[in-house]
Amino acid sequence: MRILVVTQHFWPENFRINDIVEGFVQDGLDVDVLCGLPNYPKGEWFPGYSENGPFDETYKGAQIFRAREIPRKGNTGKTIFLNYVSWPLYAAAALKRLPGGYDAVFCFNTSPVLMCWPAIKYAKKHKIPFTNYVLDLWPENLYSVLPVKNHFMRWVAQTVSDSLYKRADRLIAMSEPLQKRLIARTGKPEKDVAVISQYCEDFYAVPCPDPDLQARFAGRFNLVFTGTMTPAQSLDMVLRAVLDARAAGAEDLHLLLVGDGMSREALQALAEELHAGDAVTFYGSVPAEKVPSFTTLADALLISLSDSPDLGLTVPGKLASYMAAGKPVIASMNGAGYEAVKESGGLASPACDQAALTQNLLALYRMPAADRAALGARSKAYYEAHYRRAELLRRLESFTLRGE
């Protein structure tokens, strides 16, 4: 069977859709991908790419058709807005390049929600089912990144988002709370809104010691964060909590930030302002396959989200990769993610509660190594039970192609 995958962000950008596409191909599907030109998260073209392409490539057996976009250079409100609106327009124009013959259309819908519009356009024209995998709920996620205060603009964002979600034949939510919200907003029957968690690639479950990294960060209690740095992660609060914990006795507690994003420069400036010194390291982005080297050296893994009720509807994909590593997870978040961390034996505090996060950091720091290892084992067991790649891929394929 043939499937068209629509996603603004794709290889060589580091998103889970890369592995989903590889999994579809491994399972015998004929896959084409309509995507953008790689410039996330810095807004700079990746090596070998420019506004002039290349527009046709292959990846792990899938055919790639790239559409232009205005890069999000500088990650200002203006450039992010232009990036959000430009790619769907260019992608819609690029639909005529697709060879056709698809049995279904699948959208990996991170931000912006507008990226599903070309998928809707193609599916309706060719009368094939369209499934939208909702990773970022809009317009709520937009407000966590850009301060949209104008009431008319907020009304437009809400109306457009609801309209796009309604036009999908099927929706996939990451959690039951998100499923209920999507059903309420679209009026779709429950059978057309599936709950399928984000899995992680199998390599996250394999320890990967890196002697150089371990030597560099030896003698510290390494609290590791991996992924994108945006206002939605509230990492400024995390940094303050780490410094509070160090002042309370956790003197070698070390925050290791592995990743990049629109908040990195502001966080670095805050670290200087607070005289954080060796309490924090900004390591920068690494390929996904390199992340296990950092989770292996970690004493604990950190996940955080800002205090937004709508962010609490989702479970970040990185949580699965953290649990797969078999290390204690410490979380500052609300809702579905908070509950998953608690169920798996991790330490969770409400979003943006700096004092509570500080206390959890101190509790984990003071915990005997054997007890921390036991927490990590519980985390790994939860991953095995809920986030295995093969099962979740099978469910994605079945629901997208057959609605089952």
Placement of each model-derived feature along the sequence:
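Acidic anion/phosphate-binding donor-loop and adjacent secondary structure
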Residues: 29, 183-184, 191-192, 199-215, ...
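Conserved donor-binding/catalytic core segment of Leloir-type glycosyltransferases
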Residues: 214-233, 238-242, 256
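Carbohydrate-associated surface elements
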Residues: 37, 177, 196-199
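N-terminal subdomain of nucleotide-sugar transferases
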Residues: 1-57
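Nucleotide-sugar-dependent
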Residues: 233, 287-294, 301-324, 330-340
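Membrane-proximal helix-turn-helix segments that form the acceptor-binding/catalytic region
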Residues: 114, 121-125, 151-171
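Nucleotide-activated donor-binding/catalytic signature segment of Leloir-type glycosyltransferases, i.e.
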Residues: 258, 265-290
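Conserved acidic donor-binding segment of nucleotide-sugar-dependent glycosyltransferases
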Residues: 343, 347-355, 363-369
